[in-house]
Regions:
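Juxta-kinase regulatory segment immediately upstream of eukaryotic protein kinase catalytic domains
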Residues: 2-40
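An alpha-helical support segment within catalytic cores of ATP-dependent transferases
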Residues: 20-36, 145-207, 305-306
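ATP-binding pocket architecture of kinase catalytic cores
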Residues: 42-159
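Conserved catalytic motifs of the protein kinase core domain
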Residues: 59, 115, 200-202, 220
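Active-site Asp-x-Gly
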Residues: 203-204, 210-211, 215-268
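Active-site activation/catalytic loop segments of kinase-like enzymes and analogous catalytic loops
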Residues: 236-263, 275-294, 302-309
């Protein structure tokens, strides 16, 4: 869930909408999932795309992830399809669970005209902070996980360098529209050529590692959640997102990740483009969607600084 990105008491979706979804969920569970005997549905998390309810059941506490809408327009991406998102969450969580990566166990995926939702274990937290070192260890384990048996079809153009190049250009176009900055990048083909040096190394990337998406207990990571942004690609793409988002101590994280060589074998300009991909996404999010002024200003300046740095390294 993307709770961290919401501003103070500002609610993107109304309580009325949440109650309507809760009632629909309760009705379907009472009719189609009688064996679970789910009771006492309560909201435990709200994000940009989903709301999560907790309910007591015959299998213990369960979490129900319910999209706010089936499709959503997004300045940073193509049309967001929540059904694809739920399928992705279910598939990647099941695979990671089978490989010993900490994720909630998936119990079911319900898709219907009335409502879509994902059923998983409800993992509890004591809200004790998780050290960046431990997060680094976890991400290293994820990046080193074999993906030969992962039959996940990324809904993107191949190779990954083409997809990221096109995404950066699209995001910059949106950024220029809302800021009037007039940022100019090399053409898509040039960016793709620069990024293509990393196409051969592939692993599963979470692409949104931050405290809001890590459930911890007693300082240990109990579960990674929210695989909406996940990709298969070079680990540096995931690492630069973590660095640019800056919600985790970078030096401490790297100590836990234990692979400094990854930053030396890849051309610096690749890292800059990967950082730009995240910075412009956050600028667009905070300026146009969430309207959080100080963060919008910060990432607007980051985009401009990264743009200058990229041209110095071309």
């Amino acid at each position: 869930m993307k709770r961290t990105y919401e501003s103070g008491d500002k609610m993107i979706h109304t309580r009325g909408k949440a109650e309507g979804l809760r009632e629909k969920l309760a009705t379907i569970l009472s009719q189609d999932y009688k064996e679970l005997a789910v009771q006492d549905l309560k909201v435990i998390g709200t994000g940009v795309q989903n709301i999560v309810f907790r309910g007591d059941s015959e299998k213990g506490s369960l979490a129900f992830r319910v999209p706010w809408e089936r499709e959503v327009e997004n300045i940073n991406e193509d049309l967001f399809n929540s059904r694809i998102s739920l399928k992705k969450e279910a598939e990647l969580s099941k695979y990671c669970h089978s490989k010993g990566i900490s994720v909630p166990k998936i119990h079911g995926l319900h898709l219907s005209a009335e409502l879509d939702f994902l059923i998983s274990d409800c993992v509890y937290t004591d809200h004790m902070p998780i050290s960046a070192h431990k997060i680094g260890e976890l991400v290293s384990k994820l990046h080193n996980m074999p993906i030969d048996g992962l039959h996940y079809e990324q809904n993107i153009k191949e190779p990954i360098s083409k997809y990221i190049a096109e995404r950066i250009v699209k995001r910059i176009e949106g950024f220029n529209t809302i800021t009037n900055c007039g940022i100019k990048l090399p053409d898509t083909k040039t960016i793709e050529h620069i990024l293509s040096t990393t196409d051969d190394e592939k692993c599963l990337l979470h692409m949104d590692i931050r405290p809001a998406n890590l459930i911890g207990y007693n300082g240990e990571v109990k579960a990674i959640i929210d695989w909406d942004n996940a990709l298969i690609g070079h680990p540096l793409l995931d690492l630069m997102r973590i660095a640019e988002t800056n919600e985790i101590s970078w030096d401490e994280f790297k100590d836990g990740y234990k692979n400094d060589s990854i930053f030396n074998v890849t051309p610096h300009i690749v890292s800059l483009f990967y950082r730009l991909d995240t910075a412009v996404m956050l600028a667009n999010l905070f300026i146009a969607h969430l309207k959080i002024k100080n963060k919008g200003v910060f990432y607007k300046e980051r985009v401009k600084a990264l743009h200058q740095e990229i041209y110095k390294n071309l």
